[in-house]
Amino acid sequence: MDRVSLTKREEELMSFLWDFGEPLTVRAMLDFCPKRTWSDNYLNVMIRSLEKKGAIEACDMMRYSRQYARAFRAVLGREEYYIYMAVNHGADAALLAQAAVAFVLREKPENMDQLLQELEKVLEEYRKNG
């Protein structure tokens, strides 16, 4: 999945799917998404577009109310998409590392221990696989 460019509305839908974390039918997306700004028909168009781009996939058949429908899940991860966007705008690994440090420094002190643990996990994974 090298180049996935999403529209603003597709990003909204992907963000909802990432946050929800479980496969959903189109009907469930319409019911559970509190801030939806799209119509039923437009959601179906977005689903087809995201499926074509490889960002989501149909993964199951689920019963919703009295009908069965395909359930979709995100294949494209949030981190993967944001990395693509950053690289697409000229960022490299060094710039992303600097941005990560700047981002961490903006956090509240009470969150610092958790952030440092996450960074240590990233470094450990890099040392293992890098």
PLM segments and residue spans:
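Short alpha-helical segments that sit at the start of domains
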Residues: M1-F16, F20, G77, H89-D92, ...
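Short, cationic-aromatic polyanion-contact patches
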Residues: L6-R9, M61-I83
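Short amphipathic alpha-helical interaction segments
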Residues: T37-K52
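A short, conserved structural fragment
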Residues: E51-R63
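Amphipathic alpha-helical dimerization/coiled-coil segments
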Residues: Y81-R127
